[in-house]
A protein has these predicted regions:
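Extracytoplasmic electron-transfer domains, predominantly the class I c-type cytochrome c fold
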Residues: 359, 363-415, 428, 432
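Sequence/structural segment immediately N-terminal to covalent heme-attachment motifs in c-type
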Residues: 333-354, 365
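Residue-level detector of Asp-centered blade-edge/turn motifs that repeat once per structural unit
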Residues: 35-38, 74-76, 115-116, 166-167, ...
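Electrostatic cytochrome c docking/interface patches
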Residues: 315-342
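Hydrophobic beta-strand positions that form the internal "hydrophobic ladder"
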Residues: 41-42, 79, 120, 171, ...
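Conserved strand-to-loop turn within each blade of WD40 beta-propeller repeats
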Residues: 44-47, 81-85, 123-126, 174-177, ...
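WD40/WD-repeat beta-propeller blade N-cap
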Residues: 23-30, 61-68, 102-108, 152-159, ...
Length: 441
């Protein structure tokens, strides 16, 4: 479950002041970034893995069966992650092992650790918030004592974000139902209190109870600070860019960072409630992940690329934006033959055509035709495909996209998508037939 690889590329050491650097190695977009008190970085990716970026390069924590959406440090030695497979995993960096400790009935969008260092909160698209208490984290993974998850109900749509107060007595949650709620954790069965009624879905949430405010970002681009007790707006930083997808706060500098769907990172000085920098960080897509270094000098960001970018905050407007190259699924479709276009738009984000699966969310398609499903050696399959009798052929690939993966292979973790037009399926199959042929020895 824990595998090391030396494929990180540093443009500059993070110890050198005011230098920009990147972390490379994931096989899919970066969905979340967390930073330990020591400054070490963990990442959640569309490639189904959690990355831990230590001094010797990346270590991959593998156990999730779908895209990982969220990650957090419980301490310098323990990481938690939540994913599209509905599960919450906790990982020990010391023992090189992990364990699934709880599960929702829909994707987990956010995870947060309480000040006690033992209680994890999870935000899920099943409209619920989960509280999972774990004791014995200083022992082996097998010896951890995990309580049954307590579920908090009240939201009428999926929950996107959660945050504890510093005393751990209150939890705040943001939902697609357009509300932000507070929960009294001394009485989990008590009804929640609606603090904000935004209307549009609220995606991200930062709580600063020491200064008496919370900040949130919404699907319509709404970006506001509100009074923590009354919910009254005390500052509005909405610029019309939507949606807001990521937020990070640094308690040292009191700077708030907001990432959006148009590739900008906006910085706000919360002491004077003023925008200080508005940086076009990505030329090709959204900013899904943001996190500060412990001293507040660096902002780490992730998006549609499989790279983490780290900029020095003080001079980041003098640095270049994300320039990792155009991802294959973003290439101009007009410039491509139809079969290649279908592959790059529908398949390339998850699958490679090389011998290696290249750390992507799905197995390599090299040697696809004539191969039994579930047999690529460098990929971890779901139980559904591990024992499948399907042999990939023109007929089975056609059926896969005609019916949709969820109907052709019930229980698969493949995305639910169809290629409706027969000529598009035919062109894709022709393209795969030409580009997945194994080389003769």
């Amino acid at each position: 479950m824990l595998r090391a690889a030396c494929i990180v590329i540093w443009l500059a050491s993070p110890s050198i002041g005011q230098d920009f650097y990147t972390l490379k190695g994931h096989g899919g977009p970066i969905m979340d970034i967390a930073v330990s008190p020591l400054g070490e970085i963990s990442t959640a990716s569309f490639d189904n893995a959690v990355g831990f970026w230590g001094t010797d390069g990346p270590v991959w924590l593998e156990g999730h069966r779908a895209a990982v959406n969220t990650v957090c440090f419980l301490n310098n030695k323990i990481i938690a992650s939540g994913a599209d497979d509905f599960t919450l995993w906790v990982w020990s960096l010391e023992s090189a092992s992990g364990r699934m400790v709880a599960a929702h009935t829909a994707k987990i969008a956010d995870v947060a650790i309480a000040p006690d260092g033992q209680t994890l909160a999870t935000a899920s698209w099943d409209n619920k918030i989960g509280l999972t208490h774990i004791e014995g984290l200083d022992g082996s993974v097998e010896s951890w004592l995990v309580d049954d998850m307590i579920l908090l109900s009240g939201h009428r749509a999926g929950v996107n974000a959660i945050a504890f107060t510093q005393d751990g007595q209150t939890l705040y949650s943001a939902s697609m139902d357009g509300t932000i709620r507070s929960w009294n954790l001394n009485d989990p069965k008590a009804p929640s209190t609606v603090i904000v009624k935004h209307g549009f879905g609220v995606n991200r949430l930062i709580v600063n109870d020491a200064d008496g405010w919370l900040a949130y970002g919404a699907a319509d681009g709404g970006t506001r600070m509100v009074d923590l007790n009354t919910g009254e707006t005390i500052a509005d930083f909405t610029l019309g860019r939507r949606p807001v997808l990521s937020m990070a706060y640094d308690p040292v500098t009191k700077m708030l960072a907001i990432g959006d769907g148009q590739g900008y990172i906006m910085f706000i000085d919360t002491t004077v409630r003023r925008i200080t920098t508005d940086f076009k960080a990505s030329l090709t897509g959204p900013i899904w992940a943001l996190s500060y270094s412990p001293d507040g000098e660096y902002i780490h960001a992730g998006g549609i690329e499989d790279i983490v970018y780290s900029w020095p905050v003080a001079v980041m407007d003098k640095h270049i934006p994300m320039v990792g190259g155009i991802q294959s699924f973003l290439e101009d479709p007009i410039s491509l033959p139809n079969g290649e276009r279908q592959f790059k738009r529908k398949c390339s984000i998850c699958h490679s055509l090389t011998k290696s699966s290249a750390r992507k969310a799905g197995p390599s398609l090299y040697g696809l035709f004539g191969r039994k499903a579930g047999t690529v050696v460098d990929y971890t399959y779901s139980d559904t495909l591990s024992g499948s009798s399907i042999v990939w052929s023109e007929e089975s690939v056609n059926a896969l996209f005609d019916l949709g993966p969820d109907h052709f292979i019930p229980g698969t973790k493949m995305p639910m998508q169809r290629i409706v037009k027969k000529h598009d399926r035919d062109d894709l199959i022709d393209y795969l037939g030409t580009n997945t042929v194994q080389e003769e020895n």
